Amino acid sequence: MSTIKPSVAEKFAEHLPYHRPLAEIESVAVEMGSSPTDDGVVEMIVCRPHTDERRVLDEGVLDVSHGLIGDSWETRGADDGGPDPLRQITVMNSRILASIAGNRDRWQLAGDQLIVDLDLSIASLPAGTRLQIGDAVAEVTEPPHTGCSKFAGRFGADALAWANGPGGRRQRRRGMHVRVLVSGKVRRGDAIRKVA
């Protein structure tokens, strides 16, 4: 398990110097090719214990009531002040993230708990689709996952525009939300697949 925990400025300074321009992001994305549509792999598990803190885990527990155990999801409020069950876990495609972030050491900065090699597009995984993720089962939820100013600060304005543009939204380049239906362990390298 690795943790980024110094001050916010120190923490992200080593990761910030390079923002890929749009042409490079698009070129790398084409070169990376398409992710599988049915049987994918969990590439990275990232816990966010506190704001701007990341822990890369070899194994985690996805819990129906608490999301990723140890993550701060429950403190990231919905409109009513409580946790938003439709935004319990965020999932991002590893090939898309590699196109944007480059070095794997920077992937955790995206802030998504699960980085996976699976086609996350709306056409492939409409809301309501169930996924087996390691020993857990989760359901794709409706709310879009869009990039924010932190994402732009870490990866650049071109990355944010590419992720949030019309094609980006259809492909869910910025990722998607799921909620846990059946608690269970998830490990790096575990399968992620559609449940019939």
Can you annotate each of these PLM segments?
Residues 1-196:
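Metal-cofactor-dependent catalytic cores
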